[in-house]
Amino acid sequence: MKKPVDFFAMKENGEKITMITAYDYPSAKNVEQAEADMILVGDSLGMVVLGYDSTVPVTMDDMIHHTKAVKRGAPDTFVVTDMPFMTYHGSVDETIQNARKIIQESGAHAVKLEGAGEVVNKIARLTEAGAPVVAHLGLTPQSVGLTGSYKVRAKSAQEAQELMDNALAVEAAGAIAIVLEAIPRQLAEKVSKALSIPTIGIGAGVETDGQVLVYHDIIGYGISRRAKFVKAYAEIDETIEPALASYVKEVKAATFPEVKHSFTMAEEDLKGLYGRE
């Protein structure tokens, strides 16, 4: 299993880092078999798996439950778990307690926090306490309720400079990596070159030190709306839906199960059960 020191070396050597967001045992198993470097258990599971319209309703118990499943499916892969909405916006002590609960109960190797500002101090204190932290800048889904959209961030010079300053701040606080989401690729390149820690991009161009996409987006599974930055490497929905429809049709027509799908008893045992005629 790769560790933070390995990710630093990969950045130094120009080797791209691969991260995939997964939420359960079978998807994590697939990801580990594909030899991805990291798994993110994102609070996006609220929308992708649980059917919410945002990440806000996701709880720590949700994150722990899904991370435990991911760990069982990918025991040899570095796992990062999102701290959900409002679990790191209280006191430092509350933040440390919540991070400890997630790491101890789920087995995650690191936690991810969105934003900067007051979050920078939380990253520093978590790092001091021995909890590895991945930062997240740019589009931060937990803040969409305030910003009102999922649009590209940091397009103006002022916003770009603010993001650069925040990236340097979370690095100084001890973050082991930064997710850069939905920012101009030129800015992502500058940030990546300015930092000694790895940058993991999603909608941030190819110049970041690594990339992350959601498992479901990669395989084309259950996605009703596809973001511009997503590339689907398969279209699983195109095979799933007809397969399920065929099953329903065959059961209704009593053509499934066939004899080959059924178990039988020896004729002699049947006679013993029902009596001999």
From Swiss-Prot:
Organism: Listeria monocytogenes serotype 4a (strain HCC23)
The protein's role, per its UniProt record: Catalyzes the reversible reaction in which hydroxymethyl group from 5,10-methylenetetrahydrofolate is transferred onto alpha-ketoisovalerate to form ketopantoate.
NCBIfam families: panB, PRK00311.1
Cofactor note: Binds 1 Mg(2+) ion per subunit.
Pathway: Cofactor biosynthesis; (R)-pantothenate biosynthesis; (R)-pantoate from 3-methyl-2-oxobutanoate: step 1/2
Catalytic activity: 3-methyl-2-oxobutanoate + (6R)-5,10-methylene-5,6,7,8-tetrahydrofolate + H2O = 2-dehydropantoate + (6S)-5,6,7,8-tetrahydrofolate
Residues binding 3-methyl-2-oxobutanoate: D43, S44, D82, K112
Protein name per the record: 3-methyl-2-oxobutanoate hydroxymethyltransferase
Top-level division of the source organism's lineage: Bacteria
Subunit text: Homodecamer; pentamer of dimers.
